Amino acid sequence: MKKYIAALLTALLLLCTALSAGAVGPALTTTEAYCIMDADTGLVLAQQNMNEELHPASITKVMTLGLACQKAQGNWDGVKLTVSHEDVYSLAGTDSSHIALREGEEVPLQDALYGTMIASANDGANLLAEYFGGGTIEGGVAAMNAQVQALGLEHTHFANPHGISGNDHYTSCYDMAQILRWALTQPGFETIFTRLEMYTMAPTNVQPVTRYFSQQDKMRLSYSRYYIPAIRGSKIGYTNIARYSYVCLAEQNGVRLICVTMQSEMKTDKYNDVRTLLDYAFARYTGYTDLPSQGLTGEVEVVGGGGTLGKVTVTDPGVRLLLADGVTAGDVSVSLELPERYVLGTSPEVYAVYTVNGGDKQESTSVRVPAVLTGLDALLEANAGRELDTASDVKPARTAGMLIAISLACTAATAGATLCVMRVMRLRKTKKQKPLKH
């Protein structure tokens, strides 16, 4: 019997080793999907089902708050919003989180922002959507989806600004991580997102009582058994359909990470999984690696004035990447992603794409950064006497979806390596909306 038990334990140990040997990312997580991302570059460090379309619940509000901060541009003083009938009564029967806003109430913008963030107020989210959506919640939702498109995200569609579950309201862990990256660039957002202290909302024209909003995320409360000191800011979410969702910004020893988990069945599962993911990432990714420019160049035609003006040069800029221990600059390749032509008056969409080939040490994935464009000023000066059409007069070739990618497999460790340049033409497929996965 003892020999049988010993053999069984040995077999189980070998099985566990085999299961974990080829995987990139921590074992023993229960969440349906997760994504760990470098907050600075957007490089994915570890993931599971990161593109699966799931109900987000209240982490939806990251986009809502980001757009409100974008509109305000840090100017909150003296800005008051008036609560509409729809802000309040569209939530009737939902039994959802709120801050007891009343129709006709005049609410300072700052109070609406903190109420939506800290108290996860759905009425506050509606009010903010009207603020950046031209006066209607529907306009706010349209703005949210427009921002999704602007960020190039393919697995997100919003139907409301607060996150109450619906079949046409979904996102993915990867998309939500990118939404938070974008939101962190908006004036004032990080201040709101990282606030830990209780927030006090003074009485208003129709509410005579003072309202208090306190932090609910136990992973940010020092007295909690689930406390994680590295987490600087977070948004939690829950509905019966979505279960538990979570997005956070964490920082340790100068490394800034975004962690997203979705569809954790139990609250304690979420706590344990987030700790596991952050412990894994901070232990494995301890510092940044500077990759200088590899001197990779390409050319793009400039169109204006009814014809081609000439060409400009595009170069890879170099990048600072978060690489796992054991992964080096020699494991990174770079390519250029260029439009067929650049039309004056549009944004020059020229990118360097850095791909990490991490093997079993790091998620093999890519990150796009703006490339360096030179020669445009000289080209414009050479055509100074010519009446130049702008984007409104010339149809960009990019609308056909054609890209030219000039790729270079570069090895940093071999300075004199042969450079292999190849031109690849590919069509960008039109995105089709996918059905929600339950």
Indicate residue ranges for each PLM-predicted region:
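Periplasmic/cell-envelope proteins involved in peptidoglycan metabolism and beta-lactam response
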Residues: 145-148, 426, 434-435
